[in-house]
Each structure stands twice: as structure tokens, then as C-alpha cells.
Design a protein with these regions (language model features):
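Conserved acetyl-CoA pyrophosphate-binding loop and the N-cap/start of the following alpha-helix
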Residues: 9-21, 153-161
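Residue-level detector of beta-strand face positions
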Residues: 34, 122-124, 230
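Basic, Lys/Arg-rich alpha-helical nucleic-acid-recognition elements, primarily the DNA-binding modules
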Residues: 1-13, 24-25, 33
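Active-site/acyl-donor-binding loops of N-acyltransferases
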Residues: 40, 47-66, 152, 156, ...
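Conserved GNAT acetyl-CoA-binding A-motif
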Residues: 19-37, 166-177
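A broadly conserved amphipathic alpha-helix scaffold signal in soluble, globular proteins
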Residues: 20-24, 43, 96
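Amide-forming acyltransferase catalytic core, primarily the GNAT-like/NAT-type
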Residues: 49-163, 209-223
Length: 245
């Protein structure tokens, strides 16, 4: 959701009250809060910028020189949600399953809404007549999310989408811990950047819990060096020990 104040009511403290009440309600039940917003505005409420992602640049020349004529013809595309009640429910269940197979995911109560918010297009990926994945597209050529049943289809499917739609390029964003996707994209794409995920801001209530969760995920996906580290974070003493990471 969003927090908005009418222009005529600015300066009256409404946002401060709303955010303050929200944080008070959640502090006892959450370890971490996340939102998108302007840095200084949310710094007042204890939020700090964070996150990382890779954005790969795939252009038509990369595709032309990597795949010969006909090699991408097995892939076809259609709207993931055909605006048919039963079919939409089945598509949402398919996308939900793929999402929840990722090493780190957010539980989505309404998959269709999540994949169509902020002007996104949800596109189903088909291979030889079988649905194998989906992609979420913004602005015509920005892939903000893409999932497939078999990782070997990830890059060819994106290349096929570029070719089928006569696009000059695609910008493909992935989390840094999805190392298999990153390796496959880096073999084909023209370039990449490493950057923050939009305007992501975070407030941590329980540092030990958040650090344990994040380091566990990193150890499982990217690997981590052994060692011990101690600090006092906003009054919370924390010691981290990694062994056989």
C-alpha cells in the first residue's frame, strides 16, 4: 500500500502519526520492515537503504550471434492471465509454486495482483506447447521477474521473447544470490550493473534474527567464509560465528 497526504494537509503531522502507529503495531510481531520510498523521508522513521540486484543488458546482436535460425522457435508467449476465472486461478497457482521454490521469496496472497501491479505485464512462457514459466515485464523491455521450471530454459526463453517481439534490447533484473541465472546471463549479455533494488528501505527490529536468516540463505546460495564478528547494533549485542560455511 501507500501512505499519502492531501497537499492541503501537508505539514500537519498526518504521515508522522500514520507511520508511527504502524511501526508501534508491528514492532512486537516483525523482525524486519521493508518499503520503497525517498531516503530522507523514511530515515525519520528509522529506515535505511539496502538490497542488491544485478541488471543484465541483452540486445539483438547478442541473440543473433548466440542462437542460429530456428533454435529459439520452440518458445512461444501469451498473457499469463487470460482474464478467465478458472484459467486465471490455475495460472496463479502455477506462478505461486514457482515463486515458492526460490531460495528466498515473499508469500503472495494475491499472485495475480502482485504480477500486474505498477503497470507490469505477466507473460506466460511456453515451450513445445507446454507452459514452463512466466515473466513480468515493465515499460516494454524491463524484465523485473522471470521464473522457469528448468534453469536451462531461462536465458533462451528471454532471448526468444526479445526476438519474437522485435525488441532492440531487454533489461533483466535478478537477485544477486541467484547465481545460476547470473552465470547463464553473463555468458550471453552485453553488460550488467549491480545496484540497489529500486528505492528499497529497511528497518530492522531484531538484528540477530535477520542476520541469521540472511547468512543462512547466503551460505546456501553463494557460500560464506568462516569467522566470528561481534557488534552492538542499535543497543542489541550480536555475535555472529560461521563455521564450515
Amino acid at each position: 500500500g501507500s501512505v499519502s497526504v492531501h497537499p492541503k494537509a501537508r505539514g500537519e503531522g498526518h504521515m508522522k502519526r500514520l507511520l508511527g502507529d504502524w511501526i508501534t503495531d508491528l514492532e512486537g510481531t516483525c523482525d524486519l520492515l521493508a518499503l520503497d520510498g525517498q531516503r530522507q523521508r523514511y530515515a525519520y522513521f528509522g529506515f535505511t537503504p539496502g538490497s542488491e540486484k544485478y541488471t543484465f543488458y541483452l540486445d539483438v546482436a547478442n541473440v543473433r550471434h548466440t542462437w542460429k535460425n530456428g533454435e529459439l522457435s520452440a518458445y512461444t508467449f501469451a498473457p499469463l492471465f487470460p482474464e478467465n476465472g478458472e484459467a486465471d486461478e490455475e495460472a496463479a497457482a502455477f506462478a505461486k509454486k514457482l515463486n515458492e521454490e526460490k531460495p528466498l521469496y515473499v508469500v503472495r496472497e494475491d499472485v495475480k495482483a502482485c504480477l500486474k501491479t505498477f503497470g507490469e505485464q505477466a507473460i506466460a512462457i511456453w515451450k513445445n506447447g507446454e507452459r514452463i514459466g512466466y515473466l513480468a515485464l515493465c515499460g516494454g523491455n524491463q524484465v523485473v521477474e522471470a521464473e522457469v521450471l528448468e534453469e536451462q530454459d531461462f536465458v533462451p526463453a528471454l532471448a526468444a521473447y526479445l526476438k519474437e517481439n522485435a525488441l532492440d534490447s531487454l533489461f533483466i533484473s535478478i537477485p544477486v544470490y541467484e547465481t545460476g541465472k547470473a552465470a547463464a546471463l553473463s555468458e550471453v549479455c552485453e553488460s550488467f550493473t549491480k545496484e540497489r533494488c529500486g528505492s528499497a528501505m529497511y528497518r530492522i527490529f531484531q538484528f540477530a534474527d535477520v542476520i541469521e536468516a540472511m547468512l543462512t540463505m547466503k551460505a546456501e546460495t553463494m557460500g560464506i567464509s568462516d569467522g566470528t564478528w561481534s557488534a552492538v547494533l542499535e543497543g542489541q549485542p550480536v555475535t555472529v560465528t560461521v563455521k564450515d560455511g
